[in-house]
């Protein structure tokens, strides 16, 4: 083998080792976003739910500010329970379809079904709950104690 080939091979190996330290990205959040759009018939962009109240978005604490925020807390709790069963909700891809303008899970068993049910239930809850613009991008340090 030529020295240049060895250098290229070494560079690839080092790159792969570095990539193994990159944390995995939440893959199923794209699916969840599509479920939300299915349930609310595209009336509200998915990103409006990423920084709403005390529980919609990353993390969560305190008392939910309204019905929509309670949907997010319930979804967080569902993911926690799925994690206790050995599932990785943010990384679990599942099969579903939009029927009658509501998400329906096709995955039958295990983590795929559990996570799909968490997401479908939350998406339907979001569609029913009123959206209060005052609860978007709130000061969580003050309002979520």
From Swiss-Prot:
<feature type="disulfide bond">
    <location>
        <begin position="71"/>
        <end position="125"/>
    </location>
</feature>
<keyword id="KW-0732">Signal</keyword>
<feature type="disulfide bond">
    <location>
        <begin position="87"/>
        <end position="111"/>
    </location>
</feature>
<dbReference type="InterPro" id="IPR036444">
    <property type="entry name" value="PLipase_A2_dom_sf"/>
</dbReference>
<feature type="active site">
    <location>
        <position position="75"/>
    </location>
</feature>
<feature type="disulfide bond">
    <location>
        <begin position="56"/>
        <end position="72"/>
    </location>
</feature>
<keyword id="KW-0800">Toxin</keyword>
<keyword id="KW-0964">Secreted</keyword>
<dbReference type="GO" id="GO:0005543">
    <property type="term" value="F:phospholipid binding"/>
</dbReference>
<keyword id="KW-1199">Hemostasis impairing toxin</keyword>
<comment type="similarity">
    <text>Belongs to the phospholipase A2 family. Group I subfamily. D49 sub-subfamily.</text>
</comment>
<keyword id="KW-0106">Calcium</keyword>
<dbReference type="GO" id="GO:0006644">
    <property type="term" value="P:phospholipid metabolic process"/>
</dbReference>
<feature type="binding site">
    <location>
        <position position="57"/>
    </location>
    <ligand>
        <name>Ca(2+)</name>
    </ligand>
</feature>
<dbReference type="InterPro" id="IPR016090">
    <property type="entry name" value="PLipase_A2_dom"/>
</dbReference>
<dbReference type="GO" id="GO:0005576">
    <property type="term" value="C:extracellular region"/>
</dbReference>
<feature type="binding site">
    <location>
        <position position="59"/>
    </location>
    <ligand>
        <name>Ca(2+)</name>
    </ligand>
</feature>
<dbReference type="InterPro" id="IPR033113">
    <property type="entry name" value="PLipase_A2_His_AS"/>
</dbReference>
<dbReference type="GO" id="GO:0050482">
    <property type="term" value="P:arachidonate secretion"/>
</dbReference>
<dbReference type="GO" id="GO:0016042">
    <property type="term" value="P:lipid catabolic process"/>
</dbReference>
<feature type="disulfide bond">
    <location>
        <begin position="38"/>
        <end position="98"/>
    </location>
</feature>
<dbReference type="Pfam" id="PF00068">
    <property type="entry name" value="Phospholip_A2_1"/>
</dbReference>
<feature type="propeptide">
    <location>
        <begin position="20"/>
        <end position="27"/>
    </location>
</feature>
<keyword id="KW-1015">Disulfide bond</keyword>
<comment type="function">
    <text>Snake venom phospholipase A2 (PLA2) that inhibits collagen-induced platelet aggregation. PLA2 catalyzes the calcium-dependent hydrolysis of the 2-acyl groups in 3-sn-phosphoglycerides.</text>
</comment>
<keyword id="KW-1201">Platelet aggregation inhibiting toxin</keyword>
<protein>
    <recommendedName>
        <fullName>Basic phospholipase A2 S11-61</fullName>
        <ecNumber>3.1.1.4</ecNumber>
    </recommendedName>
</protein>
<feature type="disulfide bond">
    <location>
        <begin position="78"/>
        <end position="118"/>
    </location>
</feature>
<dbReference type="GO" id="GO:0047498">
    <property type="term" value="F:calcium-dependent phospholipase A2 activity"/>
</dbReference>
<keyword id="KW-0479">Metal-binding</keyword>
<feature type="active site">
    <location>
        <position position="119"/>
    </location>
</feature>
<dbReference type="GO" id="GO:0005509">
    <property type="term" value="F:calcium ion binding"/>
</dbReference>
<feature type="binding site">
    <location>
        <position position="55"/>
    </location>
    <ligand>
        <name>Ca(2+)</name>
    </ligand>
</feature>
<dbReference type="GO" id="GO:0090729">
    <property type="term" value="F:toxin activity"/>
</dbReference>
<keyword id="KW-0443">Lipid metabolism</keyword>
<keyword id="KW-0442">Lipid degradation</keyword>
<keyword id="KW-0378">Hydrolase</keyword>
<feature type="disulfide bond">
    <location>
        <begin position="54"/>
        <end position="144"/>
    </location>
</feature>
<feature type="signal peptide">
    <location>
        <begin position="1"/>
        <end position="19"/>
    </location>
</feature>
<feature type="binding site">
    <location>
        <position position="76"/>
    </location>
    <ligand>
        <name>Ca(2+)</name>
    </ligand>
</feature>
<dbReference type="InterPro" id="IPR001211">
    <property type="entry name" value="PLipase_A2"/>
</dbReference>
<dbReference type="InterPro" id="IPR033112">
    <property type="entry name" value="PLipase_A2_Asp_AS"/>
</dbReference>
């Amino acid at each position: 083998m030529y020295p240049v080939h060895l250098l290229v091979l070494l560079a690839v190996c080092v790159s792969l080792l570095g990539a193994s330290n990159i944390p995995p990205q939440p893959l199923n959040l794209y699916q969840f976003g599509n479920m939300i759009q299915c349930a609310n018939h595209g009336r509200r962009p998915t990103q409006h739910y990423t920084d709403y109240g005390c529980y919609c978005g990353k993390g969560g604490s305190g008392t939910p500010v309204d019905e929509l925020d309670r949907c997010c807390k319930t979804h967080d709790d569902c993911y926690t329970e799925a994690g206790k069963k050995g599932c990785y909700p943010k990384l679990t891809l599942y099969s579903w379809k939009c029927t009658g303008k509501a998400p329906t899970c096709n995955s039958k068993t295990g983590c795929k079904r559990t996570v799909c049910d968490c997401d479908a239930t939350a998406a339907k809850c979001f569609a029913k709950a009123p959206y209060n613009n005052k609860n978007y991008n709130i000061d969580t340090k003050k309002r979520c104690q």
